Amino acid sequence: MAQRVTFRRRNPYNTRSNKIKVVKTPGGILRAQHVKKLATRPKCGDCGSALQGISTLRPRQYATVSKTHKTVSRAYGGSRCANCVKERIIRAFLIEEQKIVKKVVKEQTEAAKKSEKKAKK
């Protein structure tokens, strides 16, 4: 009959955080080895694609690694991917351009109205 293994921690239930792997020791005894949960890659906040250049760790482990492992040296580095940052910059530029165009058109219409009033007098 096969040798049985038991959980080594206090939690007796087969939960996601209490997973075990059965390992045979050099002495031939089967032991339960607790397995850590797999880390997921950080994702872009806009498009959801995996961020390049950022370590794949469990949340608590980010506190122990240096800043270079958690960010990239770019605007929104570590939060947004390069393509989304590019789109944001272009969108912001176009919005500012649109505001300027709107302002110029408004000034031109006001100038035209003033010239019409002067012409009528």
UniProtKB/Swiss-Prot annotation:
- Which top-rank group of organisms is this from? Eukaryota
Record keywords, A-Z: Cytoplasm, Ribonucleoprotein, Ribosomal protein
Does this UniProt record's set of keywords contain Cytoplasm?
yes
Q: Name one GO molecular function term.
A: structural constituent of ribosome
Q: Please classify the protein's predominant subcellular localization into one broad category.
A: cytoplasm
Establish whether keyword Translocase is in the entry.
no
Where in this chain does the entry annotate a coiled-coil region?
Answer: none
Query: GO CC terms on record?
Result: cytosol; cytosolic large ribosomal subunit; preribosome, large subunit precursor
**Pfam families recorded:** Ribosomal_L34e
Which GO BP terms sit in this record? cytoplasmic translation; ribosome biogenesis
Subcellular locations according to the entry? Cytoplasm
The role this protein plays is: Component of the ribosome, a large ribonucleoprotein complex responsible for the synthesis of proteins in the cell. The small ribosomal subunit (SSU) binds messenger RNAs (mRNAs) and translates the encoded message by selecting cognate aminoacyl-transfer RNA (tRNA) molecules. The large subunit (LSU) contains the ribosomal catalytic site termed the peptidyl transferase center (PTC), which catalyzes the formation of peptide bonds, thereby polymerizing the amino acids delivered by tRNAs into a polypeptide chain.
Record-stated family: Belongs to the eukaryotic ribosomal protein eL34 family.
What is its quaternary makeup? Component of the large ribosomal subunit (LSU). Mature yeast ribosomes consist of a small (40S) and a large (60S) subunit. The 40S small subunit contains 1 molecule of ribosomal RNA (18S rRNA) and 33 different proteins (encoded by 57 genes). The large 60S subunit contains 3 rRNA molecules (25S, 5.8S and 5S rRNA) and 46 different proteins (encoded by 81 genes).
Q: Tell me more from the record.
A: Present with 23600 molecules/cell in log phase SD medium.
Q: What is this protein called?
A: Large ribosomal subunit protein eL34A
Q: Which organism is it from?
A: Saccharomyces cerevisiae (strain ATCC 204508 / S288c)
**Could you read off the lineage of the organism from its UniProt record?**
Eukaryota, Fungi, Dikarya, Ascomycota, Saccharomycotina
Q: Which gene encodes it?
A: RPL34A
